[in-house]
Amino acid sequence: MERHSASMLAVMAGAALPVMVALAGPLGLPPVPVPAANPMTSEKVALGSRLFNDKRFSSTGEVSCATCHDAGKAFTDSPLTTSEGINKLTGTRNAPTVVNAAYFTHQFWDGRSADLEDQSQHPFVNPVEMGLPNHEPILKIVRSDPEYVASFKQVFATEPSAITMKHVQMAIAAFERTIVAGDSPFDKYYYGGDKTAMNEAAVRGFQVFLGDGRCVSCHVIEQDQALFTDNRFHNIGAGINRIQDKIPELAPKFIEAKAKGLDVDKAVLSNPSTSELGRFAITEGLDELGAFKTPTLRNVAATAPYMHDGSLKTLRDVVVHYNNGGVTNKGERVNDFLSGGIRELNLTEQQITDLVAFMEALTSPQFAKPATVSALVAGGTP
């Protein structure tokens, strides 16, 4: 992990890093993009880490960002199907990992936030997540807690009364941009030239991934890096198949409610049917009905269950879903808005097994065994 460690030396020195290409990534990943408006420093990262883990920022004092994005669970809340917020309230979506979220061009499953800074503000005030009525309780804490006051002054050169949610969001985002992980057996095999790094089943699975499985169409691998996502949105038949008969009535009613001021962030996490509208809830484009963001496959073996709704329990279930053409069982009706590339694959049992083995080879070393928070954040191995 030398490339990442070297980048962290610059952060630890408190250096303001260059625009948009600041933190070198580990083997297999590109540099982490850093916005010009939110340069990285070690002090800002440390502040963001504390904010990320502070349970006082929920209405019950029992939930933090880390509750659903647990470092010990690859920054998810595995094995929960959908996340639990305050008072054990259950939302509609599976918690996506924060690992490598810095590389996404949109945040949330439906892409309703453009960046980590914007994304970080919403869970605080969602009724089924952290349940605050507004952001004022957070500002009250950070403006009065002596340690926060000192940290915000050091990082942003601001007095307590001038601390804003923008400062909070910037610090959390800075912390999240340090949570990157590559250097998997696949990376060592493909980018490091170590042909012994993957076992035979994973090597065969890699060929299925590139060929008959057609996985690489969306989970992109490039010559010198692999994000394993195209940063686009697709209807792959998960979730929306259950509500397809409701769509003619549901979609126009949602658009009408949205025009009247419906809070989309709250609606998609509280109403299961509304949640399944996917990217359509943001863009209102019929071609994005039931479409969700392509997740990265890095460390996917550590983040079960799968899909935006957690409806598929194992990696084998996921492969079978695609092999059946976007349905759990062959012969089931597919929705009318299924993305064009989704069709039956006719993979053999051996190919399915090998494909799972390949995805397991995408696990970074810090997630291959019980991890420590310091190792995860620093990008090293425990």
Residue ranges and their predicted role:
Residues 2-5, 20-382:
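Periplasmic c-type cytochrome electron-transfer domains
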